[in-house]
Amino acid sequence: RGNMFGYNNLIVDFRNIPDMLQITPTVVMDCTHSVQRPGGAGGKTGGDRQFVPAMALAAKAFGANGWFFEVHPDPDKGLSDAANMLPLDKLGELVEKLKD
């Protein structure tokens, strides 16, 4: 997910992926929670879903071989983590990019 350094933002250090691959064959990137802004929406968790594809592709570039996404047909109506959910209709295109 990342580390919390304040400012209601999570920071992801992709350099950790190759290190983890030295001790385990599988590294799964939590792409949607990584764009969360804990407490960043006035008392609830905010997020930046537009960065989910970039997070996934960056993780792939660093060697991740699995990806986790929270998806919803209408993310803004999601009961939890709405601000960082990937719209369901965007998932297929992203998965195809990750398969290349």
Q: Which sequence ranges carry the predicted segments?
A:
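C-terminal helical cap(s) of enzyme catalytic domains, especially alpha/beta-barrels
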Residues: D74-D100
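Catalytic alpha/beta core domains of metabolic enzymes, predominantly
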Residues: R1-V71
